[in-house]
Design a protein with these regions (language model features):
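Short helix/loop capping segments that flank catalytic or ligand/cofactor-binding pockets
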Residues: 64-67, 72, 93-96, 149-150, ...
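Conserved nucleotide-cofactor-binding alpha/beta core module
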Residues: 83-111, 117-118
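Membrane-anchoring hydrophobic helices of lipid-metabolizing enzymes
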Residues: 1-54, 60-71, 75, 97, ...
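Non-catalytic C-terminal accessory region of glycerolipid acyltransferases
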Residues: 117-271
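A short alpha->loop->secondary-structure connector
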Residues: 74-82
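Short acidic/polar capping segments at secondary-structure boundaries
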Residues: 61-63, 88-92, 111-115, 143-147, ...
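Glycine-rich, often proline-containing surface loops adjacent to acidic residues and nearby aromatics
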Residues: 49-52, 101-107, 135-143, 230
């Protein structure tokens, strides 16, 4: 009860400065050759988007460190600690869920039947909307799972979940204030694990990862050498959506799937 009551007011800042921040400082020194935050486009416009609370959508390179380094950079420069999503398939140990929830994570439930998946997606979408109405910043990867082959393409299912109960699709997307971010690691410590997974899937299409495999990837991704790391922020896609709708009003008449594909392309172009 104490943790719940003071989660955002007292306990969380202590976690940031007394535990999480020093750990990331050590990891930056031991596992990287430096981390940069860069801007693509109008920096003032990007910072304005950030101040109003942004939905940071990135390509996906590492299970843990993608969100961790973004939090480190945003906390250091803008004193922002984003909420972030993590799949329940990664809870290989009982304590992981409790730790990530304490660090402002929300759980993306990926198992269950069709009806369960729809209900879970609706609940998650409503929770994200609740955070955005409070101008909280959020991180979510553009796809389920890391891009093993480096082909960074936004999965339509992510946008379907985010707008699952929307009447006006484009307005619903604009309310999220999606700011695409590109992540680049000079070295991928999990490259051999990703190659192994692709090979096993090619040899046996029915092969599936175990929770132990995910834990190994998490450990290697945290401790492995990454070289230089660059996070590049881009402006909110809202500006381009407004321009596109003004020039092509017929976009509003497209099917929902076509509208989703249009926004996916915008995000991909930014990343």
């Amino acid at each position: 009860k104490h943790i719940r009551a003071y989660h955002t007011g007292f306990i969380l800042p202590l976690v940031d400065f007394l535990i999480l921040y020093p750990i990331l400082l050590v990891m930056r020194r031991k596992t990287t050759h430096g981390i940069q935050l860069q801007y693509h486009g109008d920096k003032q416009l990007i910072e304005q988007d950030i101040r109003h609370g942004a939905f940071f959508m990135t390509n996906h390179r590492d299970i843990v460190m993608d969100a961790a380094w973004l939090t480190f950079l945003l906390r250091t420069r803008y004193f922002i600690h984003p909420y972030f999503g993590i799949g329940n398939n990664l809870f290989g140990k009982w304590w992981i869920e409790h730790v990530v929830r304490f660090l402002r994570a929300f759980v993306v439930i990926r198992n269950g039947g069709f009806r369960d998946q729809v209900n879970n997606a609706t609940t998650l979408s409503q929770y994200i909307r609740h955070l955005r109405k409070r101008h909280k910043s959020i991180w979510l990867a553009q796809r389920e799972g890391r891009a093993k082959d480096g082909n960074d393409v936004t999965q339509p299912g992510v946008l379907k979940m985010l707008t699952i109960d929307a009447e006006d699709f484009f307005q619903s997307v604009k309310e999220l204030n999606i700011c695409p971010v590109s992540i680049s690691y000079e070295y991928d410590p999990c490259d051999y694990l990703k190659a192994r997974e692709m090979q096993l899937k090619r040899d046996n299409p029915k092969w599936k990862k175990s929770r132990k495999d995910d834990l190994v990837s998490m450990k290697v991704g945290i401790n492995g050498q990454k070289g230089r790391i660059v996070y590049r922020l881009t402006p909110s896609i809202n500006h381009e959506i407004d321009k596109a709708l003004a020039a092509q009003p017929e976009l509003r008449e497209l099917s929902r799937n076509e509208q989703i594909q249009f926004v996916c392309r915008l995000i991909d172009q930014h990343i």
